[in-house]
Amino acid sequence: MEKIKLVVAGVEITFEPNQAAYNKLINEMSMDNKVAPANNYLNRIVAADSKEALAGIITRPGAALQLVGKINEIYAPELEIEVKN
């Protein structure tokens, strides 16, 4: 399992993203529902020893979406796709 360690506001938090959690995030998100799925995703993938640290950070406005963005930038980077005719 891939581990991603981030230092957020001076606090180290470890995440363990996986395909099932990532897919669930994508399926739960909608145009008017982004924050709750982001919070759920982070709580699904945070390492047990980082749960308390995440709880302290996630209450900040915008924190959940910023964390999800950074984690998924590493976990699921954009593919280079070229169209050939």
State where each predicted segment sits.
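Short acidic, Pro/Gly- and aromatic-enriched capping/linker segments at domain boundaries
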Residues: 1-9
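Short, solvent-exposed loop/turn motifs
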Residues: 12-14
